[in-house]
């Protein structure tokens, strides 16, 4: 099976990709989106979001990375897709699933689900702009407020010439509510298409991954939030390994505080460590105590000292 690391805006950036791919066995990472409006973006934008482009589109541990674009205008999606692969990206991905109000308000992300023709035009333009040997993938949800258009959406992606399709098994309006996950709908789409379909949504452990694949028939999954809850989740999902022990999680957090974020204003680790601990609390009781300790700290040096001061040998 294949396990992909999902794009998560404001969460899974290059530093987190570096850490997670070092302790996992991901087959591919998708970047946070590059927002495309009405221009060919400068090289520095691509390098900021995907510094791995300067390392043959791989993380330091060797996992492939693909740039994701978000936009609605085919011409500019095409030009920026061409630039991404010229810079070394292993293919490109089109975001048609982001539920953010800000993104949707500007006509991107999940808004495209309302009109499958827009998905077709965008994906087709990207496919034509990218060399045939490189993949063009599309990430969608089942629809905007219902799944009525799920087949139209899927057909649009395939007819556009996309290499593969990632389906998040909920509509935009359903957000991330667990009770609405519909792996069967993903399976219905998989049976309809001739291109690979990757299942996404509510995959938290070995059991849920097996259940998702059994219901959907997919042999590839994409994981997002769960990758932060359990830092070695790809190995749990692929090989039924136990979750990472808490001392190893702390060691990972300590390494994180030592990494430098390019262009950091001093607030990067403050926000990200707290954010990561809030995810870890869902799986590790020890993370709650640590979160309570650092939540009142407001600068990177203090956060780093608090994390570094933990004696792993005593855990």
Swiss-Prot record:
Active site (record annotation): 98 (proton donor)
Cofactor: FMN
EC number: 1.3.1.-
Listed CDD domains: DUS_like_FMN
EC category: oxidoreductase
Additional remarks: DusB and DusC together account for about half of the 5,6-dihydrouridine modification observed in wild-type cellular tRNA, and DusA accounts for the other half. These three enzymes seem to act site-specifically on the tRNA D-loop and contain nonredundant catalytic functions in vivo.
PANTHER family: TRNA-DIHYDROURIDINE SYNTHASE, TRNA-DIHYDROURIDINE(16) SYNTHASE
Protein name: tRNA-dihydrouridine(16) synthase
Chain positions recorded as FMN binding sites: 7-9, 68, 139, 200-202, 224-225
Organism of this sequence: Escherichia coli (strain K12)
